[in-house]
C-alpha cells in the first residue's frame, strides 16, 4: 500500500506542551512535541502509522493567546498550500479557542476534498495518562 501523505500542522496548546511532575505548570515546546507526537504515532496500531508526514509549525502558543492576526496566519498557510497533495490534514491546537478555530476553518475550508481534523489534549504530552 502506498504511504498516505498527511499534513500535520502544529499550533501549540497543551497538546504541544510539557508539564512538571505535578502537571501544575506547562511549557509550550512545539518543536520538541513534533518529535514525540510522530514517535508515538509510529508506535501505534494505526494503519497510517507509516504515513508520509509533512510537519509545519505555524504557531507556538497556548491557544488562549490566539489573536485575529494568528488566525490569519493559519488561514494564509492553508490557502497557499496545495491540499490536494495530501490524504488529510491534522491540526494540533489548544482547547481554549478550539471551538472558534474549528468554526472559522469550517467556513474557510468549505469544499475541501480531504478530511481536516483538529486535535487537542487536556494533558501535556509527557503525562502518562
PLM features per residue range, with description:
Residues 1-129:
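Active-site histidine-anchored catalytic micro-motif
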